[in-house]
UniProtKB/Swiss-Prot annotation:
Species whose genome carries this gene: Mus musculus
Compositional bias of kind Basic and acidic residues: 385-396
Region (Involved in nuclear speckle localization) residue spans: 398-770
UniProt cross-references to Pfam families, sorted A to Z: PAT1
Name of this protein: Protein PAT1 homolog 1
Length: 770
């Protein structure tokens, strides 16, 4: 290795990044020189020796008509001397057939020839065609059967001048000091970088492929990996553990052991790109340093020499075997030669040093490389390629995740999706979809009536009707699991575990358990009755959608469920003449039960609804007490008012007696007023009482054929109600929800004017009358 005085003497290309990196690598190169040749290798003034050698090479005459050979040469002549001309060496690497190609010769002739500068080393080697000398193939084939490609490319030894007859030992540098690592160099030392004078061919090849290990200091790896196209230094190249540029990849985590000759060879081979090798890369091969080609313009060499050199795909191929001989020009088909066909843009290639990758990753890279090659071939190919190109593009557009499922698996997924559309009751399972299309049908019907435009046909999803087997669900029960159900549901709520244990007597626990069980049974009855109510409310829609022959069965089923609801409310047991009010009162004590009764009343018959109203009137004070917090009883006023208009006069009178807690017969003793007082102090009770009085008065005035007994009962009830309204204070009287309009005429028949004004003031009827 030489340290050049200026960047112009450097044999690298005119790359600014390489020039900047050269100065940074000087210190590292000095360290490698010390480790290789000893600490005294650079003590002497070797720069003066290098300049002296450079002046000797400048004095060498470049003879254009020099003879190509002087007879037989021995093996040392084939390897070449140390002062042979690099320009002639490169000229002998040019293939004979390519020079005879007329296309290349025309390209060479059309380019302007640069005039060489006198006294400089930058003169072009293309100044004369006689410089391009042919390689003596037969001579090399006979005398050098085992010569490698690098030795094959070396030209013949030129004639020695008068100064070249001297041995190189006369120009040798002074003796160097002993190196602590590899000892001192031989006595006949030569400048650093000078090729060996004598070396046998087998040993030379063996040193290239399997060099002797020399322990050197491993350099620091680069912080960022360099791109594929950029040049890297030999130190960085040697730091690659599994590079494909080496003959034998090093194992991981082991620093490579290379000889100085291999470092110089890797410097030239690592820069090779697939398909092309520029002349500047030839200039970095050991033995070419310091030659006239080092100072030539690299762009000129890339334009002229790069087209004629055979492609060198990788560094290993450059040292393995010579390229195949090109057929003679007369065998070429008409058209551009193969060297011009190679000028087409090539598809991007993947770097070859992928031995460290996973086998699956390497296979993916290979597949991508094949796809890029096929795509490039289809785009740049000639002839009829329309069908093939379209099929290839379709193949590229193909979804990589396609055909991952078998047809059996696809059918299985389709069946699962179709099962969601199979329903015995689409209106219940897909309520919003059905209502949405009902609205659309109504809008379309309105548009047809108006006749604004043509009828629009809307596509509607047809849900298949499938017979669904109904089975009774029975939760799993385990004996001894705290004595409770293992599955919690609405019908079977799970008991919470008592965290606090209090000491109670057996009687208290028994009573509490009875109350708890009774309430739990009531909740279960409410849930079952609510389920029946929802089914009954849905029968109207089912009746409209059903066929004519199916409607009688639906009506019978509806009546049966209505009777079941009434039995659940009244709690009538088999064989019992009159149901007990206790069961109904327990339902009415729960807020959900009161709302449910208000929804059930319109579906019941008149007799059934009247029975519910009678039970409510008899137990109204107790229900008012339980409803003090919820205040849900007013929701029953509207269905009760509608029911009163369908009841006869006898039933209305009986209801009023039950509400006022009056005896059914005149012989019975007069009851206490606590019951009626509680009714008057509640807005629901007072409103219900006024509605009953108004409806009874209408029935009494409209039907003159009423018996005297019924008339007497009605008159007695009216006097009792009027007397109680006058007795109760106005502050204690509740404000009614609604007031009938015929109350003034009703009270005027039973009281005088003074009492009538007092009643009007209490009930705030003045605004309603006037």
């Amino acid at each position: 290795m030489f340290r050049y005085e200026s960047l112009e003497d450097c044999p690298l290309d005119e790359d600014e990044d390489a020039f900047q990196g050269l100065g940074e690598e000087d210190e590292e190169i000095d360290q490698f020189n010390d480790d290789t040749f000893g600490s005294g290798a650079v003590d002497d003034d070797w720069q003066e020796a290098h300049e002296r050698l450079a002046e000797l090479e400048e004095k060498l005459p470049v003879a254009a008509d020099e003879q190509t050979g002087n007879g037989e040469r021995d093996e040392m002549d084939l390897l070449g001397d140390h002062e042979e001309n690099l320009a002639e060496r490169l000229s002998k690497m040019v293939i004979e057939n390519e020079l005879e190609d007329p296309a290349i010769m025309r390209a060479v002739q059309t380019r302007p020839v640069l005039q060489p500068q006198p006294g400089s080393l930058n003169s072009s080697i293309w100044d004369g065609s006689e410089v391009l000398r042919r390689i003596r193939g037969p001579l090399l084939a006979q005398e050098m059967p085992t010569v490698s490609v690098l030795e094959y490319a070396l030209p013949q030894r030129p004639l020695q001048g008068p100064e070249d007859d001297r041995d190189l030992s006369e120009r040798a540098l002074p003796r160097r000091s002993t190196s602590p690592i590899i000892g001192s160099p031989p006595v006949r030392a030569v400048p650093i970088g000078t090729p060996p004078k004598q070396m046998a061919v087998p040993s030379f090849n063996q040193q290239i492929l399997c060099p002797k290990p020399v322990h050197v200091r491993p350099p620091m790896p680069p912080r960022y990996p360099a791109p594929y196209g950029e040049r890297i230094s030999p130190n960085q190249l040697c730091s690659v553990p599994n590079s494909s540029l080496l003959g034998h990849p090093f194992p991981p985590n082991v620093p490579p052991v290379l000889s100085p000759l291999q470092r110089a060879q890797l410097l030239g081979g690592a820069q090779l790109q697939p398909g092309r090798m520029s002349p500047s890369q030839f200039a970095r091969v050991p033995g070419f340093v310091g030659s006239p080609l080092a100072a030539m313009n690299p762009k000129l060499l890339q334009g002229r020499v790069g087209q004629m050199l055979p492609p060198a795909p990788s560094f290993r191929a450059f040292f393995s075997a010579p390229p195949p001989a090109t057929p003679p020009p007369q065998q070429h088909p008409p058209g551009p030669g193969p060297h011009l066909q190679n000028l087409r843009p090539q598809a991007p290639m993947f770097r070859a040093d992928t031995t460290h990758l996973h086998p699956q990753h390497r296979r993916l890279l290979h597949q991508r490389q094949l796809q890029s090659r096929n795509q490039h071939r289809n785009l740049n190919g000639t002839g009829d390629r329309g069908g093939h190109q379209s099929s290839h593009q379709d193949h590229l557009r193909k979804d990589p995740y396609a055909n991952l499922m078998l047809q059996r698996e696809k059918d299985w997924v389709s069946k699962i999706q179709m099962m969601q559309l199979q329903s015995t009751d689409p209106y219940l399972d897909d309520f919003y979809y059905q209502n949405y299309f009902e609205k659309l049908e109504k809008l379309s019907a309105a548009e047809e009536i108006q006749g604004d435009g043509p009828k629009k046909e809307r596509t509607k999803l047809i849900t298949p009707q499938v017979a669904k087997l109904e089975h009774a669900y029975q939760p799993v029960q385990f004996e001894g699991s705290l004595g409770k159900l293992t599955v919690s549901s609405v019908n079977n709520p799970r008991k919470m575990i008592d965290a606090v244990v209090t000491s109670r007597s057996e009687d208290d626990e028994t009573k509490e358990k009875q109350v708890r069980d009774k309430r739990r049974k009531t909740l279960v009855i409410i849930e079952k009755t609510y389920s029946l109510l929802l089914d009954v409310e849905d029968y109207e829609r089912r009746y409209l959608l059903s066929l004519e022959e199916e409607r009688p069965a639906l009506m019978d089923e509806r009546k049966h469920k209505i009777c079941s609801m009434y039995d659940n409310l009244r709690g009538k047991l088999p064989g019992q003449e009159r149901p007990s009010d206790d069961h109904f009162v327990q339902i009415m004590c729960i807020r959900k039960g009161k709302r449910m009764v208000a929804r059930i009343l319109p579906f019941l018959s008149t007799e059934q609804a009247a029975d519910i109203l009678m039970a409510t009137a008899r137990n109204l004070p107790f229900l008012i007490k339980k409803d003090a917090q919820d205040e849900v009883l007013p929701c029953l006023l509207s269905p009760f008012s509608l029911l009163l208009y369908h009841l006869p006069s006898v039933t209305v009178t009986s209801l009023l007696q039950q509400l006022m807690n009056l005896p059914q017969s005149a012989s019975a003793p007069a009851p206490s007023n606590s019951h009626l007082t509680a009714v008057l102090q509640n807005k629901f009770g007072l409103s219900l009482l006024l509605i009953l009085l108004s409806r009874g008065e209408d029935l009494q005035s409209s039907d003159p054929a009423i018996e005297s007994t019924q008339n007497n009962q009605w008159t007695e009830v009216m006097f009792m109600a009027t007397r109680e309204l006058l007795r109760i204070p106005q502050a204690a009287l509740a404000k009614p929800i609604s007031i009938p309009t015929n109350l003034v005429s009703l009270f005027s028949r039973y009281v005088d004017r003074q009492k009538l004004n007092l009643l009007e003031t209490k009930l705030q009827l003045v605004q309603g009358i006037r």
